[in-house]
């Protein structure tokens, strides 16, 4: 499978509309949500420390923004741009320059902005996987995707909000554990539904 075929598979651009399945997407996201939130619940002290350091962690910011750059280059290189296809090469040049400029001149809360960008990018494959699927339970995926979109926009434009949210959530261990259990529960429900109903 070449990169164009991979793009077509992820975003259901094949002539028969085949691609990334609802079941596979649900299983992967369910596992990620369940395991990550269970880790946060079982290791509250360590995970709270990680969460508090994250907003101003420059290393994480560069790593996540690098992932966003590669993802954006992939999209720009293989997406159907219609009548704007002549701008493709300029876009491919602008993206790395923007990456460098953001790292150099927007260091404040870089990790939060990068995470917000990643959330915006990640929402699209999830929405494509659930599009036109008959199961009502498919809505578990679009709900998650739209939460990512809304929160991602706030993280990019108002990154200090993540610091405030983390401060609130980590004020007590009980509050952190409750939030972790809620995330784990959503992941487990999504995983079970994906295995049984998708």
Where are the model-predicted features located?
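N-terminal topogenic module of multi-pass integral membrane proteins
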Residues: 1-70
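Hydrophobic alpha-helical transmembrane segments and adjacent interfacial helices
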Residues: 66-78, 98-105, 122-133, 184-191
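Membrane-proximal helix-loop-helix units in multi-pass membrane proteins
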Residues: 83-151
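Membrane-embedded alpha-helical transmembrane segments of multi-pass integral membrane proteins
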Residues: 29-32, 36-39, 67, 95-99, ...
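Juxtamembrane helix-loop boundaries in multi-pass membrane proteins
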Residues: 22-26, 46-67, 115, 141-145, ...
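Helix-coil boundary and interhelical linker segments in multi-pass alpha-helical membrane proteins
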Residues: 12-20, 75-85, 128-139, 195-198
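Short juxtamembrane and helix-loop transition motifs at transmembrane-helix boundaries
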Residues: 46-55, 71-84, 99-110, 164-168
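Terminal transmembrane helical module of multi-pass membrane proteins
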Residues: 133-198
């Amino acid at each position: 499978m070449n990169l164009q075929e991979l793009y077509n598979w992820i975003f259901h651009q094949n002539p028969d509309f085949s691609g990334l399945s609802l079941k596979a997407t649900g299983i992967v996201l369910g596992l990620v949500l369940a395991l990550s939130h269970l880790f946060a619940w079982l290791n509250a002290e360590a995970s709270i420390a990680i969460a508090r350091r994250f907003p101003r962690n420059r290393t994480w910011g560069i790593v996540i923004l690098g992932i966003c750059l590669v993802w954006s280059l992939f999209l720009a290189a293989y997406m159907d741009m219609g009548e704007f296809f002549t701008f493709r090469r300029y876009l491919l040049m602008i993206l790395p320059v923007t990456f460098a400029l953001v790292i150099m001149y927007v260091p404040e809360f870089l990790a939060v902005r990068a995470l917000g960008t990643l959330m915006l990018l990640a929402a699209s494959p999830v929405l494509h996987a659930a599009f036109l699927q008959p199961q009502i339970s498919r809505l578990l995926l679009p709900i998650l995707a739209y939460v990512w979109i809304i929160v991602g926009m706030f993280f990019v434009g108002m990154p200090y909000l993540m610091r405030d949210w983390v401060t609130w959530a980590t004020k007590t261990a009980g509050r952190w554990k409750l939030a972790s259990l809620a995330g784990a529960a959503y992941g487990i429900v999504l995983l079970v539904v994906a295995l049984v109903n998708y």
